[in-house]
């Protein structure tokens, strides 16, 4: 539900390299400066939305005039920015502690230090301390258990979630109260999978144009390889590097002239991995509460695979008792944690073998651990023959990133995008953008706001102008072109993201627009600026410095969750006590979690509001429904409540809306929401590509899904072009009318 929190988790992924030097460098006083980066040594690794945050050193801005590092938001669209100091060693001990000083300014989300111990479940990002707004220097401490048998790296840093600015300084990390810089690292105990480095420098596979049979062979290999990865006990124990095993078997499968030869090559490989012992306690899964059953594709289809291979795979299926798996774990709430996957981030343009690994890895994660696979809209197996040739044909980093983007977009999940700074994809989109906002209104691309008052943009383009062509390309043709590359759950959300990601981007700063203004065609030239310099905040939330609640005409309470804080709830209750109703403007991402704080204040009735589906390590591909959740009503507020939603309402906003809907006095108006709810799971792919998926299925108590469809809407209300030109907020006006009974 909390998308921002999981964005924060997304980039703090497993790092498996061990440095040769034995001296621990934390440099928490920031005094040792790297000559190239001009940043403190060991503190030049950034995570999160790098384009939307500034990372700087203030040489005297810290506690008592000491050096401090800064994270500052540049736009309203950033989810989080973080510094990551990696200590690539393990130590003897039982407790780890991070201490440091932190100061904040106008933080809308939350800020804090973070600490993660790779190889274990130990993680804390101080979200529960709810540090936001403006705060003076204060020392903070994170204390976690330290499992020296399984710990790999220590990742320490500071983060800013949402908008604002933070300073931090005087960072120290202790093991059993001894600074790590005074400790001697212990020799790490590696899994056998980590010791197999045979292909760490590349596969040596040359590019080739696959025949139809080679595509079929590779598709079959992908399915068997993933099945083995998530079912064979030897793999689950961490004894097999499945990336390396793919590269070992792939050449013989590519050479196979037909399915029979491909089956023989795959069977020989399976035999080398070993047969599992007979499992006397293994049994078929219970059919109770099953939301989605495992799908094994073609691997048991005897018109595709040989009988002997099918029998061996069937034996593995029914003789594994994997309660844990080296490559997959389940978070406490039930979403998948794809452990021990290597990002190979130094391979910006991976060779053909690693490009296929990216496809195979992602395909099997979706096949076995995506709760909404049945909502994708096509047979997931059909993706392989379509994308195998594209991944093989990618001639450079740009084409590889674009192929990966098409793959990721094919699951139709608004959480699924390329969230890392993929330079190839950035080059494809173009670094320049015009300094105005445009949205699809009444199926037309309409100028709706200005990001920057620069380069004569307000003279060239007016609010309400309809853009029909960009640099000679018709908008409707551009939409068709970029739909397969726009990762979103539904068409409305694809149109939400497409202007910023593709339509209003170019490698050239000179833009030419065909425009309809009051029905008259015009051609307008507009110079663009670097996309990273656009002030998205000015358009997305013009009132970002104001409180998240106020009175409207002394009759209606208004709450904007993007600026709401739970500490304000007592003041809100007092201010709203005599109002006729409350408008909750959910066309944003909530800055704090509201379902069990604000919702009880307005709720009446006993209705439950949500249930989840989650996956299984023991039965990969199986998803079960969990128990329904309930918000206990305070029943303090007696007026009407109207929640406004649109395509900007995503993840936590959708979950919060569902909680509101469990109250009988709530009406939801607006338009289709983003259709991406549930805790997210991070995925890394070769080339350092970072993405994620919705890791839990989210349903109303009656079983109605929200993925792709969005939340239920009682009354559809959309902006019009005429309303945009007149400066009206038509959904807000309708919400007022509902409360006042007009």
Model-derived segments and spans:
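Cleft-lining beta-strand/loop regions that shape enzyme active-site pockets
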Residues: 213, 229, 254, 367, ...
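PDZ/PDZ-like domain segments forming the peptide/carboxylate-binding groove
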Residues: 213-214, 219-222, 226-227, 294-331, ...
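Extracellular and organelle-lumenal recognition/adhesion modules and their flexible linkers in secreted
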Residues: 20-192
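Cationic-aromatic interfacial patches
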Residues: 200-202, 220-340
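Conserved PDZ fold ligand-binding element
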Residues: 224, 228-232, 249-250, 362, ...
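PDZ/PDZ-like peptide-tail recognition elements
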Residues: 191-198, 401-457, 542-551
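Bacterial Sec-dependent N-terminal signal peptides
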Residues: 1-24
């Amino acid at each position: 539900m909390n998308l921002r929190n999981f964005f924060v988790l997304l980039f703090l992924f497993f790092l498996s390299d061990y440095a040769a030097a034995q001296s621990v460098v934390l440099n928490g006083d920031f005094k040792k400066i790297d000559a190239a980066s001009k940043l403190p040594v060991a503190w030049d690794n950034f995570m999160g939305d790098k384009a939307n945050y500034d990372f700087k050193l203030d040489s005297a801005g810290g506690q008592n005039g000491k050096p401090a590092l800064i994270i500052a938001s540049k736009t309203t669209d950033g989810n989080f920015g973080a510094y990551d100091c990696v200590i690539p060693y393990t130590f003897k001990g039982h407790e780890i502690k991070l201490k440091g000083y932190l100061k904040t300014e106008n933080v809308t989300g939350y800020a804090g230090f973070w600490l993660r111990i790779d190889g274990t479940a130990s993680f804390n990002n101080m979200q529960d301390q709810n540090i936001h707004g403006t705060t003076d220097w204060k020392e903070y401490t994170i204390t976690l258990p330290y499992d020296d048998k399984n710990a790999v790296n220590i990742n320490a840093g500071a983060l800013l979630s949402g908008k604002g600015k933070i300073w931090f300084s005087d960072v120290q990390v202790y093991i059993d109260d001894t600074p790590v810089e005074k400790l001697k690292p212990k020799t790490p105990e590696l899994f056998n999978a980590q010791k197999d480095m045979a292909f760490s420098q590349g596969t040596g596979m040359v590019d080739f144009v696959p025949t139809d049979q080679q595509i079929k062979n590779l598709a079959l290999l992908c399915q068997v390889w993933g099945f083995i990865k998530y079912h064979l006990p030897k793999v689950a124990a961490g004894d097999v590097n499945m990336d390396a095993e793919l590269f070992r078997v792939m050449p013989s499968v590519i050479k196979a002239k037909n399915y029979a030869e491909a089956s023989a090559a795959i069977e020989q490989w399976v035999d080398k991995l070993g047969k599992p012992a007979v499992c006397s306690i293994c049994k078929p899964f219970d059919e109770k509460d099953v939301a989605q059953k495992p799908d094994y594709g073609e691997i048991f289809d005897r018109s595709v695979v040989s009988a002997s291979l099918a029998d061996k795979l069937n034996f593995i299926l029914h003789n594994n008792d994997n309660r844990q798996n080296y490559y997959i774990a389940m978070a406490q709430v039930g979403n998948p944690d794809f452990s021990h996957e290597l990002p190979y981030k130094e391979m910006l343009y991976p060779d053909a073998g690693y490009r296929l690994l990216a496809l195979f890895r992602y395909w099997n994660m979706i096949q076995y651990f995506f709760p909404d696979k049945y909502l994708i809209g096509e047979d997931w197996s059909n993706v392989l023959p379509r994308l195998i040739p594209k991944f093989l044909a990618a001639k450079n980093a740009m084409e590889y990133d674009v192929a990966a983007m098409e793959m990721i977009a094919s699951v139709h999940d608004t959480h699924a995008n390329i969230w890392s700074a993929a330079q190839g994809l950035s080059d494809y989109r173009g670094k320049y953008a015009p300094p105005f906002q445009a949205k699809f209104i009444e199926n037309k691309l309409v100028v709706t706001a200005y990001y920057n008052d620069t380069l004569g943009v307000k003279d060239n383009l007016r609010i309400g102008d309809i853009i029909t062509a960009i640099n000679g390309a018709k908008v409707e043709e551009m939409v068709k072109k970029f739909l397969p590359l726009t990762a979103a759950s539904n068409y409305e959300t694809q149109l939400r993201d497409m202007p910023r990601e593709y339509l209003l981007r170019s490698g050239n700063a000179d833009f030419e627009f065909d425009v309809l203004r009051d029905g008259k065609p015009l051609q307008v030239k507009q110079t663009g600026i670097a996309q990273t310099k656009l002030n998205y905040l000015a358009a997305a939330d013009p009132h970002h410095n104001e409180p998240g609640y106020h009175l409207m005409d002394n009759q209606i309470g208004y709450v904007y969750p993007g600026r709401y804080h739970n500490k304000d709830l007592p003041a809100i209750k007092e201010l709203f006590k005599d109002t006729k109703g409350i408008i909750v403007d959910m066309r944003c991402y909530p800055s704090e979690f509201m379902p069990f704080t604000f919702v009880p204040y307005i709720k009446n009735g006993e209705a439950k509001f949500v249930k989840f589906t989650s996956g299984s390590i023991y039965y990969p591909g199986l998803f079960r429904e969990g128990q329904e959740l309930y918000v206990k009503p305070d029943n303090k507020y007696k007026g009407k409540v109207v929640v406004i939603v649109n395509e900007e309402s995503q993840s936590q906003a959708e979950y919060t809306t569902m909680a509101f809907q469990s109250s009988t006095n709530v009406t939801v108006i607006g338009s289709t929401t983003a259709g991406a709810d549930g805790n997210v799971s991070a995925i890394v792919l070769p080339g350092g590509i970072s993405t994620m998926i919705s890791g839990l299925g989210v349903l109303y108590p009656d079983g109605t899904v929200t993925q792709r469809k969005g939340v239920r809407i009682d009354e559809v209300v959309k902006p019009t072009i005429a309303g945009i030109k007149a400066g009206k907020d038509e959904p807000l006006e309708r919400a007022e009318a509902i409360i006042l009974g007009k």
